[in-house]
Amino acid sequence: MSETHLSTQKFADFPLHKEVHQALNEAGFEFCTPIQALSLPILLEKKDIAGQAQTGTGKTLAFLVATFNHLLSTPIPAERQLNQPRAIIMAPTRELAIQIAKDANLLAKHTGLKVGIVYGGEGYEVQRKVLDKGVDILIGTTGRIIDYVRQGVINVSCIQAVVLDEADRMFDLGFIKDIRFLFRRMPDAKSRLNMLFSATLSMKVQELAYDHMNEPEKVEIAPNEKTSKNIKEEIFYPSMEEKMPLLLSLLEEDWPEKAIVFSNTKHSCEKVWSWLEGDGHRAGLLTGDVPQKKRLRILEQFTKGDIDILVATDVAARGLHISDVSHVYNYDLPDDCEDYVHRIGRTGRAGQKGVSVSFACEEYALNLPAIESYIQHSIPVTSYDSDALLDDIPPPVRIHRKPSTHTRNTRDRSSGRPQGGQRNGPRRHDKTRRHS
């Protein structure tokens, strides 16, 4: 993390349990981020918070530290049964729940507290067997949690700490009735520690907080800055015919370490993926109908660097928490202004620099004024030289083919860039495509 992202507040200065301090030290966490520095003093006094912070600001560690410390500081209810977790952390997507669980296990190893994770789409019986052994901290998506509650597999009447992460996305995905269902079955709000985090503290999010929390204090990090200063934004105005050549040319010119390409529809994502695969890129495709096991496999490949570019719709990408994404490409400008913020927030995380490139084509250019009004600044326009776009682009692959694994897809940075795919002719590097 860069110094600009961190505060001067050290974790060591907080009165945390020694087991929590030990885990933080072993994980390399010394200084707090702003959201951690502001929220932890409140939470350690056992007061509720409703926190607003951009994605990638460290809010996950903030509520995990508070949750672990609270459970270690609070007596276990005498009547607690094996199927009653002491804390529950609700997330809008499987991927976010999985990431939270990974971070939680880092903090758990010296505490003796058991972490369990549940989510829909797979592993119902496997997850149930874990719950049958008892967990202290339950992390998961609301639908699967409710399934287990209704079947009596778990009981939430001994909950001592609650976290609702990405509450605004919970509303977007229609999960609020599920959340209220669970809250009504928990102890009174005054007898538990309640934490809510959201990218935006809209009126509906604040209403949820005040309905189910105990006079939460509002914590805001740069609420007027919708996008991170660590992200360099630019926008191009390509014709429909030049969108794909421009994308492929910029990918070669930028040579991103790890990139996400967003498009507005499943069909468009499949088209983009087909061209990327045909041009020799190691690309993964995430749309709403990708099976869960394949989805997790693609995300694991992307995280490990076996895939360099992820092509995704907004629905499929919600809740993704992947580090070191260097570039985000908006092949289509989103129809929803908040989706623009969430998209580019995949890069420039944890103090790192990021790049956001958007295309304002004939079909979606009308979305730009609303987006710029929402983010409260104009996106710098970049022109390009049409004659400098790649003209040796191989044809796209068929969508039913599995991503190829032969040497054409091996991006060996030591020996230069791919040489024109199937044509094997050197691409032009004598002309820059960007003109300020």
UniProtKB/Swiss-Prot annotation:
Residues 243-390 form the Helicase C-terminal domain. DEAD-box RNA helicase involved in RNA degradation. Has RNA-dependent ATPase activity and unwinds double-stranded RNA. The keyword RNA-binding applies. Its EC number is 3.6.4.13. A motif (DEAD box) lies at residues 165-168. It holds the Pfam family DEAD. Gene3D superfamilies: P-loop containing nucleotide triphosphate hydrolases. The gene is rhlB. It is found in: Cytoplasm. Residues 425-436 have a biased composition (Basic residues). It catalyses: ATP + H2O = ADP + phosphate + H(+). CDD domains: DEADc (cd00268), SF2_C_DEAD (cd18787). One of its GO terms (cellular component) is cytosol. GO terms for biological process: RNA catabolic process. Keywords: ATP-binding, Cytoplasm, Helicase, Hydrolase, Nucleotide-binding, RNA-binding. A motif (Q motif) lies at residues 9-37. Belongs to the DEAD box helicase family. RhlB subfamily. Residues 392-436 are annotated as: Disordered. The keyword Manganese does not apply. SMART domains: DEXDc (SM00487), HELICc (SM00490). Residues 40-219 form the Helicase ATP-binding domain. The lineage of its organism: Bacteria, Pseudomonadati, Pseudomonadota, Gammaproteobacteria, Alteromonadales. ATP binds at residues 53-60. Component of the RNA degradosome, which is a multiprotein complex involved in RNA processing and mRNA degradation. GO terms for molecular function: ATP binding; ATP hydrolysis activity; RNA binding; RNA helicase activity. This is ATP-dependent RNA helicase RhlB.
